[in-house]
Each structure stands twice: as C-alpha cells, then as structure tokens.
Amino acid sequence: MMKMKTLLTLLLVGVLVLAVGCQPADETPGEAAEEMGSVTLGYVSWDSEIASTNVLKVVLEDLGYDVDMMDVSAALLYQGVAEGDFDLTTAAWLPTTHGDYINQYGAGLDDLGPNLNGTRIGLVVPSFMDIDSIEDLATGEYAGTQITGIDPGAGIMQATEAAIDEYGLDYELLEGSDAAMAAALNDAISYDEEVIVTGWTPHWKFASYDLKYLEDPLGIYGSDEDIHTLARVGLEDDMPEVYAVASNFHWTPDDMAGVMVAISEGMGAEEAARQWVSENQDTVNGWLQ
C-alpha cells in the first residue's frame, strides 16, 4: 500500500511540473502585452486626432503592446510628452497652429516628422452664405456676430482671436469643443441659418456639408500645414520597435477622412480604426518595416 501511495505522489508531482513548465505556452494576451511593454498616447479630442490616435493604438496593440490613450488640452499634451508622461502624440499641427508650444517645450520633444501632409485651418461657413472673405465680416452682422470655436488654448482659437483683432471684427468667439462646434454647424445648416465656425481639414464635416473657407488676405491662419508625430526624448532607446512604427506612420487626408466619417456616422472610434487597419493592410505593413 505504501509503495502505491509513493507512486501516486510521484505521478502528481510530475503532472504539476509539466503543468508549470507548459504555462508560457498558455500565456494570456494581457501577460504578453505586459512583457512587450505599455505605451501611452496623448491626444486632443479633435476628430482628426481621435482618428489617428486610435489607428496607431490598434497597430501597436496588434504587435502585442498594452496601449493607453489620454485626452488632454493642447497645452498639457505638449507638456506631457516633454516631461515623459506620454510616449507619443500624433497631434502636432506645425509650423503655425502649435508653433508656440514647440517654442516652449521643444527641448523635450523628438519630432518624428509629418504623419499627414496638407492641412489647413481658418474660418468656415456654409457655402450658401454670401461672403467670401474674413474682411466681409466687418461689413455686416453675420451669424449673430458670433464665431463658434472649440476648446480654449487650441492654436486655432489663438489665431481666431488674432483675426478678430487684426480685421477689426466686433464678433464674439465662443469656446466649446470639436463636438459642440460640429453640433452647432449641423443645427444651423439644418435650418438654413448662418453660422461661422473655426474649421480645419481634414475633417469629416467637409464630406457631410457644403462648406467653404473664408479667404484670409492678412494670412493670420498661415499657409498649409502638416500634422507631426512627436515622441518623448528617450523613446527610441527604450522602445525601438514602437519608435520605428511611429516614425513610419503616415497616411493621407482621404485615409483619415474615412475613419472620421465612420465615427461621425455612429461607429465607435476604435472599431472604425480597426476596420480601416483591416482594409488597408498594405499601408499598415509599410509602417512595420
């Protein structure tokens, strides 16, 4: 009987050893992501940045990284990357819109270059409005002498405050958010009412409504810009694969618009990003080289 008990004990020990030895093969996705490391992406809650940040998040997660997204103001975004609170951001509008933040925090930022070329900012109105230039706003009381803006501190808000001063406009700039601006635009167009909003491309509203930029003869809003990817200093050494993917990340305004339109039509941001990644594997594979 004792021999039988000893044999059973040895068999149990053997089974436990085998089970423990096989554990890495059954590693959970969470454990794998923990081994790869965690990445924190900072962004501002503008539709364009929601699209790009979610796409980069999906690509990095597919490589096995644990990715967090943090929504902050533009000022805190640059400060966060410079101080190492965020690893990356895809939301740097340069050289004009966010130029002041680069001047302030540039020493702590690693500029990986443009991820999207050919952006524009300015004042936008429905095409049915009988004005074509910011100068025209001074000749009448359009849209109740109100300009619907986004979050305070955004570069486009600073430029609009400058435009009001330089063009001598007696207009009020309303602070809000990207979503609130889009809602105000939709409501006004639905009732054929005048509205003036701070606008930028790429943005899904240009695919959904007939809009136009007001000409800016004084050049307050600058010329065409690019959206850059910024990394914290040291990321290249700490996470070379993440750094390489972020450096290669580049897409077109049409690519971004595809994600933004899907979100505006009710799809979740991450779902829209995953759909785009699935449908554009050739582009994504280029980022992974």
Which sequence ranges carry the predicted segments?
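A conserved helix-loop-strand patch within extracytoplasmic ligand-binding domains
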Residues: G106-G153
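A bilobed periplasmic-binding-protein/Venus flytrap-type ligand-binding module shared by bacterial periplasmic
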Residues: R120-D130, E225-M239
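Short beta-strand->loop
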Residues: G108-L116, E194-H203, A207-G222
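Short helix-initiation/N-cap motifs at beta->coil->alpha
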Residues: V44-D47, D68-G80, L173-A184
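Ligand-binding cleft/hinge of the Venus flytrap
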Residues: V55-L63, E141-L173, S278
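Bacterial lipoprotein signal-peptidase II cleavage site
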Residues: A19-E31
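Pocket-flanking alpha-helical
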Residues: T53, S73-A107, A183-A184, W204-D210
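Short, well-ordered beta-strand elements
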Residues: A32-S48, Y65-M70, G144-T148, A246
